[in-house]
Amino acid sequence: TQESRPTLTGVNFIFNNSSIKAVPTDSHRLSQRQISLENGPQTSTDLIIPGKSLVELSRIIGESDPEITVNPGENQVLFEVGNIAFYSRLLDGQYPDTDRLIPTESTTSVEFELPVLARSLERASLLTHESRNNVVKMTLDVQNQLVKLQGDSPEIGNVEEEIGFKNLEGEGLTISFNPDYLREALRASITDSIIMNFTQPLRPFTVIPAKQDVNFPQLITHVRTF
């Protein structure tokens, strides 16, 4: 849990001379955003910054896209944004090795337009939020080129609908997951289309941008339903 592993309340930033990578995880899901960096440090720098501090920093920045200077110290970090200086403490500890968790290959892949998937997910999860088990089931029928999303509530009933998609390939698959995790991944996405990559029904899956030049994989764990 985050209480027993304080580092999971923070975001791991890895700086080098040409890029910056930010990785948050709560052990049920993770995301990894990497962008190119100008004037990076000559030696690799690894920081764990509290999530609450980053929320406050984002409020200061707002919708603008300013130049930010990051000055790490021994126990704290200084962000300089224009004439504003923002200090945050750093978290002690070792962040999990998340690189090994993200699959490099997949057996099933489906591409969606983000708004289409988001609307279907919203409808399917209306029922699941009424039950104790907040789980939806996605069925990928490659042979018949169908994708279905199903939500159930023992007290109310179930909803099932087909989802429109742009491309579906690989092996047929049925997987269950927490719809809130996928919803938040879609909200964080920065492209109009996303690709979901799967390996096995009982393994985590990834949500990635449908653009080659955007490095932003998000990993979501499955939910066992038996």
Per-range role (PLM):
Residues 101-105:
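Bateman (tandem CBS) regulatory domains
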Residues 1-34, 40-91, 106-226:
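DNA polymerase processivity clamps
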